[in-house]
């Protein structure tokens, strides 16, 4: 999981979700696209 100041979708399968006040990107097609803001 990458931790970045700015998270954005990398591919069409990426989804932006909020968990516990943080913004996450989850991706079913490519697990390397997982990101968290912070």
UniProtKB/Swiss-Prot annotation:
One GO term describing the cellular component: cytoplasm
Keyword Ribosomal protein: yes
Keywords, alphabetical: Ribonucleoprotein, Ribosomal protein
InterPro entries attached to this UniProt entry: Ribosomal_bL36 (IPR000473), Ribosomal_bL36_sp (IPR035977)
GO biological process, one term: translation
One Pfam family per UniProt: Ribosomal_L36
Gene Ontology molecular function, alphabetical: structural constituent of ribosome
Highest taxon listed in the record's lineage: Bacteria
Family: Belongs to the bacterial ribosomal protein bL36 family.
Name of the protein in its database record: Large ribosomal subunit protein bL36
Source organism (scientific name): Psychrobacter arcticus (strain DSM 17307 / VKM B-2377 / 273-4)
């Amino acid at each position: 999981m990458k931790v970045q100041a700015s998270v954005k979708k990398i591919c069409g399968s990426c989804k932006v979700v909020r968990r516990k006040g943080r913004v996450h990107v989850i991706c079913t097609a490519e697990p390397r696209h997982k990101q968290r803001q912070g």
